Amino acid sequence: ASSKEIAEAIGIDSATVRRDFSYFGELGRRGFGYNVKELMDFFADILNDTSITNVMLVGVGNMGRALLHYRFHERNKMKIVMAFEADDNPAVGTTDENIPIHAISEIKERISEANSQTAILTVPSVKAQEVTDILVEAGVKGILSFSPVNLSVPKDVVVQYVDLTSELQTLLYFMRKG
């Protein structure tokens, strides 16, 4: 990425990017720009941020399976370490992408093994609150929810919603506008 591209992405001018990066030595090459992966690795080392965050996936339907196949750890510092599904689901007891799929009723026992307080929720809307309650009771403190319902959680639990319909509508709006 060029210094101009980096500057636009973070809202500063390109001269500031070049000057600030120069304090750390030669991070880029004139005319070629910066290798973003190398920059991220470089700054992660400086900030001592080399740890990987373990994440659990709850719901192994179509969306869940797609996320199991996504290589989070290759692009950033996150890794899905285990998945959970309804107790009677045939996927329970199997693995996908070397990720074990457990019964949701086992989450309390498995959460310490996962070494995670973060879950991705991809369950049907009608089950979202029930499953969220189970996650919270098991000690989960952060939930990325793909279910289009507002979840009720205690104040110490953070929920981030991914609403694909809203994102698509926003995209279409800007396509028509531009």
Curated annotation (Swiss-Prot):
Record GO biological process: negative regulation of DNA-templated transcription; response to redox state
Subcellular location: Cytoplasm
Tagged with keyword Transcription regulation: yes
GO cellular component term, pick one: cytoplasm
Keywords: Cytoplasm, DNA-binding, NAD, Repressor, Transcription, Transcription regulation
GO MF entries: DNA binding
Binding site for NAD(+): 59-64
UniProt-listed InterPro entries: CoA-bd (IPR003781), NAD(P)-bd_dom_sf (IPR036291), Tscrpt_rep_Rex (IPR022876), WH-like_DNA-bd_sf (IPR036388), WH_DNA-bd_sf (IPR036390)
UniProt-listed Gene3D superfamilies: NAD(P)-binding Rossmann-like Domain, Winged helix-like DNA-binding domain superfamily/Winged helix DNA-binding domain
SUPFAM superfamilies: NAD(P)-binding Rossmann-fold domains, Winged helix' DNA-binding domain
Record-linked PANTHER family: REDOX-SENSING TRANSCRIPTIONAL REPRESSOR REX, REDOX-SENSING TRANSCRIPTIONAL REPRESSOR REX 1
UniProt function note: Modulates transcription in response to changes in cellular NADH/NAD(+) redox state.
Record-linked HAMAP family: Rex (MF_01131)
Family: Belongs to the transcriptional regulatory Rex family.
Name of protein: Redox-sensing transcriptional repressor Rex
Source species: Streptococcus suis
